[in-house]
């Protein structure tokens, strides 16, 4: 209903003066239902349990992470928003030991990932590699960075597309910890 009101109001604007405003507002009005639909569908999704390698080239089964709520960050070293959010995620990993933080790198080698982490002074646990992109596809990730929040039962509770800030991550983590009571 809100999108229809917005379209009606934009339609009344003079074309010559506000053409670019109309385009932006109409695009936003059209994309909002798509965004809501994607999040609605994803709420029923369950977490895939792939087997991958970590940045030490050891095999890791995602099933080992099902004892706590999960924050899965999908990222790459070449992605500027990914690089900016890493210190925020590192701090959250230290502040929330009752959660599993998983950092799933896209398409890069262990050497590239480790060089990046060392150059930035990042001490991240659970750095996993998705060299082919198949794992991120199984999680429904098409944009970097994307952060997924799962219950211990593997139910997707929230999806954040784009870089996280301290405030947006804290809010999502509070929602995650409140929706999954401690055992």
Where are these regions (language model features)?
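Active-site acidic short loop of glycosyltransferases
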Residues: 66-68, 98, 122-124, 141
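Short pre-active-site segment immediately N-terminal to redox-active cysteine/selenocysteine motifs
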Residues: 68-70, 75-78, 143
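Solvent-exposed coil/turn segments that connect beta secondary-structure elements
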Residues: 55, 77, 106-109, 130-132, ...
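N-terminal targeting signals for export/organelle localization
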Residues: 1-51
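Structural microenvironment flanking redox-active thiols in thiol-disulfide oxidoreductases
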Residues: 83-120, 131-137
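Thiol/disulfide oxidoreductase modules built on the thioredoxin-like
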Residues: 116-123, 130-181
């Amino acid at each position: 209903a809100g999108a229809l009101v917005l379209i009606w109001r934009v339609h009344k604007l003079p074309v010559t003066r506000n053409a670019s405003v109309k385009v932006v507002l109409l695009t936003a009005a059209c994309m909002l239902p798509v965004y809501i639909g994607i999040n609605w569908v994803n709420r029923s999704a369950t977490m895939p349990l792939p087997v991958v390698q970590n940045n030490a080239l050891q095999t890791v089964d995602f099933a080992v992470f099902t004892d706590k709520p999960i924050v899965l960050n999908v990222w790459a070293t070449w992605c500027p928003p990914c690089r900016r959010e890493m210190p925020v995620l590192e701090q959250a990993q230290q502040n929330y030991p009752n959660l599993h933080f998983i950092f799933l790198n896209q398409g890069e080698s262990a050497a590239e990932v480790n060089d990046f982490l060392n150059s930035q002074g990042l001490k991240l646990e659970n750095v996993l590699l998705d060299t082919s992109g198949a794992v991120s596809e199984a999680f429904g990730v098409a944009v970097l960075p994307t952060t997924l929040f799962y219950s211990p039962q593997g139910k997707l509770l929230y999806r954040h597309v784009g870089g996280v800030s301290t405030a947006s991550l804290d809010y999502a983590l509070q929602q995650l910890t409140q929706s999954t009571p401690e055992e």
